[in-house]
Amino acid sequence: MEAIKDFFGSLLLTELFKGMRLTGKYFFKRKMTLRYPTEKTPASPRFRGLHALRRYPNGEERCIACKLCEAVCPALAITIESDQREDGTRRTTRYDIDLTKCIFCGFCEESCPVDSIVETHIHEYHGEKRGDLYFTKDMLLAVGDRYEADIAQRRAEDAPYR
């Protein structure tokens, strides 16, 4: 009985019509695919992307070399070296982040008592060599200087939720 049913099913092309019905169902729906470089999905305001080091308005870097971010980093991606100044304060001489190790968890940003290290909204960066994804203190300060207005605005918007 099953063989006869299969014979008439294939003779009447029911499998073809079932497939065409499924194709037609999705053919007229709105497309979900975006053409990436020209079209982008909106990112969350809390998106964690490329790191940046911030400065105070007078131009002095915020980092006080407390090394909390280095201690809390689960991937051990942050390396900090510091020196004592003549006035008794500590400042970093070396602040490196290896983005090949970083898991973008945001613990460094949360642990910083002076809001020095932040994660920006930038997610489009690349490197041709492994060393290109190793960010030094000067590179992180340059990112912070370039996007300071945007960083300050996003942190002000997010302040009620902290």
From Swiss-Prot:
Q: How does it sit in the membrane?
A: Peripheral membrane protein
Where does the source fall among the domains of life? Bacteria
The record's annotation in Pfam families points to: Fer4_7
Among SUPFAM superfamilies, the record links this protein to: 4Fe-4S ferredoxins
Q: Where is the 4Fe-4S ferredoxin-type domain?
A: 53-83, 93-122
Q: Which UniProt keywords apply?
A: 4Fe-4S, Cell inner membrane, Cell membrane, Iron, Iron-sulfur, Membrane, Metal-binding, NAD, Quinone, Repeat, Translocase, Ubiquinone
Q: Which reaction does it catalyse?
A: a quinone + NADH + 5 H(+)(in) = a quinol + NAD(+) + 4 H(+)(out)
Q: Where is this protein localized, as stated in its record? A: Cell inner membrane
- Tell me the GO molecular function terms: 4 iron, 4 sulfur cluster binding; iron ion binding; NADH:ubiquinone reductase (non-electrogenic) activity; quinone binding
Cofactor (UniProt): [4Fe-4S] cluster
- The positions annotated for binding [4Fe-4S] cluster 1 are 63, 66, 69, 112
Q: Which GO biological-process labels does this protein carry?
A: aerobic respiration
- The residues the record assigns to binding [4Fe-4S] cluster 2 are 73, 102, 105, 108
Q: Which GO terms describe its cellular component?
A: plasma membrane
On cofactor binding, the record's note says: Binds 2 [4Fe-4S] clusters per subunit.
Question: What is annotated about its quaternary structure and interactions?
Answer: NDH-1 is composed of 14 different subunits. Subunits NuoA, H, J, K, L, M, N constitute the membrane sector of the complex.
Q: What is this protein called?
A: NADH-quinone oxidoreductase subunit I
Which organism encodes this protein?
A: Bordetella avium (strain 197N)
Name the gene behind this protein.
nuoI
